[in-house]
Amino acid sequence: MRRAGGGSLIHMASVTGHLGHPGITVYGATKGALIALARGQAVELAADNIRVNTVSPGTVDSPMLHRFLADHATDIQKAREAFDRLHPRGKVGSIGEVAAVFVFLASDEAANITATDIRCDGGYGARGQQPTS
């Protein structure tokens, strides 16, 4: 990137890097550390015209969610509906919605965005304590 005159480095973090989730505390800690790493990299690399950001998705309709439900839910459809209800939009995100944030951050339109974490979580992180039913 230095030889090319700059660029955009985008790390995949997670909303769990901002929130406490029982049972996945180590995962959340690593994502929080990644957010901090990106901020430091952004400062270090700014003079080289390299922007560094993170994207923090919430729950996404993805193979990761499907594996989680298959491993932990007795009624997968009911569990999926419960995940949807955790989000103010009433549904989990899509892979395409998360990818669109990456495309934007890599674009010239995001030329002044660095050392920033963008949550793509459908409002999940804004709810505070999550409902269980």
What do these predicted ranges mean?
Residues 14:
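Residue(s) in the substrate-gating loop at a strand-loop-helix junction
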Residues 19, 103, 114-133:
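Short C-terminal tail/terminal secondary-structure segment
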Residues 20-24, 29, 46, 129:
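Active-site "substrate specificity/gating" loop of NAD(P)-dependent dehydrogenases
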Residues 43-47, 111:
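Alpha-helical segment proximal to the catalytic Tyr-Lys
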Residues 54, 62, 77-109, 113, ...:
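C-terminal helical subdomain
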